[in-house]
């Protein structure tokens, strides 16, 4: 797959420390999505489509189970467990929206700020879905130092490699700081 090749190239660049994929950025709060609790009642939460590198690179803590490895595997946060009503282990359970199955839960991540510390904790599902992940096609890159020089290098490389595409780079630190200004 061409996207996997691009990822392999990015991860092999000497000025990139790490790379992961997702459909949105963690500081944007993910996409709003409804889920169904154990009584069949809908509630709103957040969803993101990630790869297996996302959780370790972004420093999310797995409290139970393991990280995603295969398509259709899901990580949920503590708040989603509470909202769904699962009081025993969620590992192996199906995350649902009415009759639609998002995937099988393989782990629980510690709650984290998914948009703003000024908002209540969101229910979050992180789904390993290759198809959905490529729809938005976001890359989270951690550059090695010196950051400015390496940012210039990756911008030049992308412009040369994809001359017809408008590939943009943003600093996660600046985006988070903007949330609190």
Regions inferred by a protein language model and the residue ranges of each:
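Structured, solvent-exposed hinge/loop segments at the ends of secondary-structure elements
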Residues: 1-84, 88, 98-102
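"Rare, low-scoring activations can occur
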Residues: 2-20, 71, 78-79, 97-181
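A glycine-biased structural micro-motif
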Residues: 91-92
């Amino acid at each position: 797959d061409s996207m996997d090749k691009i990822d392999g190239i990015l991860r092999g660049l000497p000025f990139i420390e790490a790379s992961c994929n997702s459909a949105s950025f963690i500081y944007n709060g993910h996409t709003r999505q409804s889920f169904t609790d154990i009584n069949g009642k809908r509630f709103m939460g957040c969803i993101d489509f990630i790869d297996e590198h996302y959780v370790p690179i972004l420093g999310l803590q797995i409290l139970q189970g393991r990280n995603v490895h295969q398509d259709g595997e899901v990580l949920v946060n503590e708040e989603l467990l509470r909202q769904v009503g699962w009081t025993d282990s969620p590992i192996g359970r199906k995350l649902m929206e009415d009759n639609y199955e998002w995937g099988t839960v393989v782990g629980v991540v510690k709650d984290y700020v998914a948009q703003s510390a000024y908002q209540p904790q969101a229910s979050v599902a992180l789904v390993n879905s290759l198809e959905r992940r490529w729809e938005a096609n976001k890359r989270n890159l951690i550059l090695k130092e010196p950051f400015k020089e390496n940012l210039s290098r990756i911008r030049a490389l992308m412009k040369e490699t994809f001359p017809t595409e408008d590939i943009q780079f943003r600093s996660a630190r600046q985006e988070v700081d903007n949330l609190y200004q």
